[in-house]
Amino acid sequence: MIHIDIESDIEYKDVSLNLIVDHINGEAKYTKQWCKDNKGDFPVYSANNNEPISYINHYDYDGEYLTYSKNGCAGYISIINSKFSINGDRCVMSINSDYKDRIDILYLKYYLEPIFRSNKKGRLGDLGKNEFTKLNSTMIKKLNIQVPIPITSDGTYDLEKQKEIANKYKQIDEIKQGLIEKIKSLVEIKVVPSGE
């Protein structure tokens, strides 16, 4: 289906996420002990979106990939661009060859993450703490997500427009992160009354 965003005059074509990517589950064998026994220089990512759990002596992926957490704080998407592996708490979305140079990975991340987060299942934490939610590839496939891809006047995917939209979302994200850091520093300020 093709539709036009009236406000921005951008024409879009809806494409099924199930056509765009393959979901590849991580290896359950990459436990902390296994990683300890096979130490090396290549990161292994788990449910945590910020830091690898360990470094091992080989890698399963080499390049830029979308990955998402399946357990814990499920549905957050990270872009990893290196030689790396993932364990069973994470999934890689590999862009299929038909879409490889036609879909911007950052555009896909910003479009998908709110959908993933709104479809997670499990225990939500209080005030963003102690969340334990799940979202696996089977759940995502069943959603049959339609991704609106900007197209040019001749109907081809508009990679530049995707990048432009993604960069606007990235700027908003960076502003939000800056505000969060400022709020954290304000909360930590201790006011000591002077001895009057």
Question: Where do the protein language model's features map onto the residues?
Answer:
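Non-catalytic DNA-recognition/assembly elements of restriction-modification systems
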Residues: 1-49, 152-196
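Intrinsically disordered, low-complexity boundary segments flanking structured domains
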Residues: 7, 28-34, 52-57, 77-81, ...
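A generic structural signal for short, solvent-exposed coil/turn residues
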Residues: 9, 36-37, 59-60, 84-85, ...
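Sequence-level motif detector for i,i+2 pairs with an aromatic at +2
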Residues: 12, 39-42, 63, 81, ...
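A short beta-sheet element
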Residues: 46-50, 56-118
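A short glycine-rich beta-alpha junction/loop motif
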Residues: 84-91, 124-153, 159-160
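Long, highly charged amphipathic alpha-helices
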Residues: 107-111, 141, 164, 168
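Short leucine-rich amphipathic alpha-helical surface patches
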Residues: 112-119, 147, 169-176
